[in-house]
Amino acid sequence: MSEPHLLIDAGNSRIKWALADAQRTLVRTGAFGHTRDGGADPDWADLPRPRGAWISNVAGADVGARLDALLDTRWPGLPRTTIRSRPAQCGVTNGYTTPEQLGSDRWAGLIGARAAFPDEHLLIATFGTATTLEALRADGRFTGGLIAPGWALMMRALGTHTAQLPTLTTDIASGLLADAQAQPFQVDTPRSLSAGCLYAQAGLIERAWRDLAAAWQAPVRLVLAGGAADEIARALTLPHTRHDALILSGLALIAAEASAQD
């Protein structure tokens, strides 16, 4: 049996990891914080030594150094590759005017989406610290995207930069809206803020999807991913598909392609 690949997605809020076998199946997964204060270290004690680590890191140099230390402690000398966006890879063509400016997480997510939904036009909406949208044609061409503040960031910005509005987390907002989803307008300030920011997310997605379908004159599958996807999905009036492992799946494909060329 060939050695597995260790895949690491270091996002703006947390770090997710997976172990992928030779068939690119994610056989073990987990998550941990950027710092020890953010939670325990990853539970890698019983993992077999991987062939190498493939990393998407959009969280910065400090997180990169933490990952290096964790890897060196568990598997000294383990080969590792921090991916960068390319003009083309794994069947996806990068439409950015400067391809390397595209975040490595978005690039890996596009590759994962292309493999999960081959030969389909896609709008991929990922809900994290930022909300990102990617337009991917059925032939693998990424034609561009959008970046907006995420749901939590929208609410935090309003709480921080106004005198009378509360600062809400997504957990608080979800609780407030649990019994109010059927109401288009809310009757107190916390719920109004929660729902307003939620509808801003949903409105962005629906407008982008309609514009894309009109421009391409073809059906477009809407794919949702990320931590806030459940709440935003409930506010959408469009059919959609949930997939929460696009980035890790894309990393598995990148690792497999590179290993095949060794």
From Swiss-Prot:
It catalyses: (R)-pantothenate + ATP = (R)-4'-phosphopantothenate + ADP + H(+). Keywords: ATP-binding, Coenzyme A biosynthesis, Cytoplasm, Kinase, Nucleotide-binding, Potassium, Transferase. One of its GO terms (molecular function) is pantothenate kinase activity. ATP binds at residues 9-16, 129. SUPFAM superfamilies: Actin-like ATPase domain. One of its GO terms (biological process) is coenzyme A biosynthetic process. This is Type III pantothenate kinase. It comes from Burkholderia multivorans (strain ATCC 17616 / 249).
